[in-house]
Each structure stands twice: as C-alpha cells, then as structure tokens.
Amino acid sequence: MILYHGSFLEIAKPDLVHSRSNVDFGRGFYVTPLYEQAVKWCGKFKRRGKDGIISRYEYDESRESELKTLKFDSYSEEWLDFILNCRSGKDSTDYDLVVGGVANDKVFNTVELFFDGLIDKAEAINRLRYEKPNLQICFRTEKALSLLHFEGSERL
C-alpha cells in the first residue's frame, strides 16, 4: 500500500522523536493513503511561506498482523473518546498503529465544541455520523515504522 506524508521537508527516515504529543492519535508518525489529504497537510506550511513536500512510502501490509492495531471505521463514540484522551495527554494505550478519521475543519469544530463542554457527547456523535472520514494512519512505535519504506518525495 502506498502512503503519503505532507510536510515542509522530505522525510526519508521517519522517526518518533520529532512527533508532537496531544494530537488526534497521540505521538507518532502520521500518513494517509489519500494523496489529496497529504496535499492538505502541506497547506499549513505553504501558508507560512515554506515548501510543501509530500513523502511517499510503501507499507508492508502483509506484516500488519504483527502489530497491535486500533482501527476506527467511522467517527464514533469510541473514536471521540480516543481523540479526547490523546489530545489531553491521557492516552496510556500501547498500540503500534492507529487507523481512523482525520479531524478536518468541520469535524474539528465539532470535536472542539465537545472538548469545551459546549455540546454533549450525544450531540457530537450525531453531528459526526454524517461526515465521511478522511483516513489517517499513525505509526506509534519503531516496530510499526519498520514496515514503512521510503520511496521518494515531491515538492508542491
């Protein structure tokens, strides 16, 4: 499977050292199988006057069974709870790989309203169920990263 990472620089050797904490699926290296999603991720760097660079990887899916994986097929109560724990620094899970929806602008607004206590969980789930998830994959361990092989990059 081909996966993409959007940044301001080429990342030939992904690592966990440079990852941020308190994001959707916790500390890790984020990729997507959707080229258009990687282009969107580059947008924030381009708006700051930096280059947008998409790095491309081959992911060895045949070995995914070796990883402890959490998959969210939709925006759900479980997804929302997991995002809340990760973004608030309370995630204590040991997943190698987490797969699920991206909190895009509309989804992010709903999540923020919930985090801020302005809507309850039921209302947040009701709003999210109509959204089609964009897919992100978070490689959270070195074991998971070992299945990701750099193939090249392109400047936008």
Kindly give the residue locations of the regions a language model identified.
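Short aromatic-glycine-(Arg/Gly/Cys) micro-motifs in beta-strand/loop hairpins
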Residues: 1-23
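Short, conserved beta-strand segments within well-ordered enzyme catalytic domains
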Residues: 3-5, 30-31, 56-58
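Conserved NAD+-utilizing ADP-ribose enzyme module
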Residues: 23-24, 44-156
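Terminal, compositionally biased segments used for targeting/anchoring and flexible tails
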Residues: 9-11, 40-43, 59
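A broad, structure-centric signal for solvent-exposed, well-ordered loop/edge residues
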Residues: 11-13, 38, 66
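Extended catalytic/binding region for NAD+/ADP-ribose chemistry, centered on the ART fold
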Residues: 20-44
